């Protein structure tokens, strides 16, 4: 995961201001979603994930947000 550890990526789900949206471009075989929010270390992180069962999530990838993604996130909140 590009500069973001698995443990750090999983903390984004605790961000009450995080934004979740569908990832239609990568959802051919499974319903992938993307969350953008702050990790507990304060980084703005983008995580691609799939909900497997209730309360079970599989992380696919995670990375720090680009400057454009950061601006988009700030305007969506």
What are these regions (language model features)?
Residues 1-77:
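Ribonuclease/tRNase effector modules and their secretory precursors
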